[in-house]
UniProtKB/Swiss-Prot annotation:
Organism (species): Saccharomyces cerevisiae (strain ATCC 204508 / S288c) (Baker's yeast)
Entry protein name: Putative UPF0377 protein YHL045W
UniProt-annotated location(s): Membrane
Domain of life of the source: Eukaryota
Alphabetized UniProt keyword annotations: Membrane, Transmembrane, Transmembrane helix
């Protein structure tokens, strides 16, 4: 499945309330099957995943290196459409972006999920 990759920010939506948490170093993917975008973390070291971006001497954002191995699964996690690439609900795990409050939650939230 072809994916387009963008580096961006996101908010967590829990119980229809935006917590306004910014995800640094995460990836925004666009599903080639249904065209919906969703946020997804890369399989990177723990400290890298939760590291804030660094600003270069030119004032540009520098993000961590993302390395995708053969075990990294590209799946559509958008709840806004029915897509053949969506995983079963029980496989979806949400990670909060704080090292102090890393929580696994087995329920789908609005567009923010990891496997």
């Amino acid at each position: 499945m072809k994916m387009l990759l963008f580096l961006n920010e996101a908010c967590i939506f829990i119980d229809s309330v935006c917590e306004g948490i910014v995800f640094w170093g995460l990836c925004l993917f666009v599903c080639a099957e249904c065209g919906n975008a969703y946020y997804r973390g890369a399989r990177v070291p723990y400290k890298t995943l939760f590291r804030a971006f660094e600003v270069s001497v030119f004032g540009q954002k520098e993000y961590p290196n993302f390395r995708f191995g053969p075990s990294y699964r590209f799946l559509c996690l958008s709840p806004y459409s029915i897509c053949c690439k969506q995983p079963p609900m029980e496989e979806v795990i949400l990670y909060y972006p704080s090292p102090d409050s890393l929580i696994k939650n087995r329920k789908r939230v609005l567009g923010v999920a990891y496997l």
